[in-house]
A protein has these predicted regions:
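Conserved beta-alpha-beta core of the PfkB/ribokinase-like small-molecule kinase fold
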Residues: 24-103, 120-122
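Conserved phosphate-binding/catalytic loop of the ribokinase/pfkB sugar-kinase fold
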Residues: 1-36
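Active-site donor-binding loop signature of nucleotide-sugar glycosyltransferases
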Residues: 2, 85, 135
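A short, aliphatic-rich alpha-helical micro-motif
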Residues: 18-20, 76-77, 107
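Alpha-helix N-cap/helix-start capping motif
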Residues: 3, 87-88, 148
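Short gly/ser/thr-rich secondary-structure transition/capping motifs
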Residues: 4-11, 62-67, 95-96, 133
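Conserved phosphate-binding/catalytic region of the ribokinase-like
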Residues: 47, 69-70, 95-194
């Protein structure tokens, strides 16, 4: 991944007033790799006073999780509400020997964990229970952006108060659209077609 100018995002760049009205604060896991980014994340987490604001974390990459585990643990200690990850990232964060052990790790957590498994669909772990959602059967062209599309779509549905199974179903559908095109974004028409679902 190329972080570009975002690697220099620091606490001074944050609009804290806007954050007070935010429904979700979404933390991209790559932000642990930059001291400025990590400082900004901690500053925002410390400043959130609205108990309705959902704090969501993407684990981003298994190698990043392994290399910066202490920083991820520090973010977790602020009281995360949701974690998004793929199966490799889930195993890395849980420091588990296999996926089954990782599932048990997340069942004992207070936050919701949403795990994507590519063509095998996705799993939500919430309050000790598992909810499985099958993938949409398609022929992928390019998986770039699929995880971000999944997380964004899931959170969109969650804010609209969909049942968790429906959140996952919508996210699976949306991410199935992104992998059928080259690049990490849909056309404007593609996004509009999703909004009306």
């Amino acid at each position: 991944s190329m972080l570009g100018i975002s690697a220099y995002l620091g606490s001074k760049d944050i609009n804290y007033d806007a954050l007070e009205n935010s429904k979700i604060f979404y933390i991209e896991g790559y932000m642990v790799t930059s001291d400025e980014n990590f400082g900004a994340v901690k500053s925002v987490l410390s400043s959130i006073k609205n108990k309705e604001t959902i704090k969501a974390l993407s684990l981003s990459d298994a190698g990043i999780v392994q290399g910066f585990k202490e920083k991820f643990n520090e973010i977790e200690s602020y009281g995360i509400d949701m974690i998004f990850c793929n199966d490799d990232e889930a195993i890395a964060f849980a420091e588990a020997e296999n996926f089954g052990n990782a599932i048990n790790f997340y069942k004992n957590k207070s936050y919701m964990t949403v795990i994507t498994k590519g063509s095998e669909g996705s799993i939500i772990i919430n309050k000790g229970k598992e909810i499985f959602s099958p993938a949409v059967s398609i022929e992928p062209i390019d998986t770039n952006g699929a995880g971000d599309m999944y997380a964004g779509s899931f959170m969109h549905a969650y804010l609209r108060r969909f049942e968790l199974s429906k959140c996952a179903e919508f996210a699976n559908y949306a991410s199935s659209k992104i992998v059928q095109t080259f690049g990490p974004r849909l056309t404007p028409e593609g996004y509009l077609s999703l909004i009306h679902i």
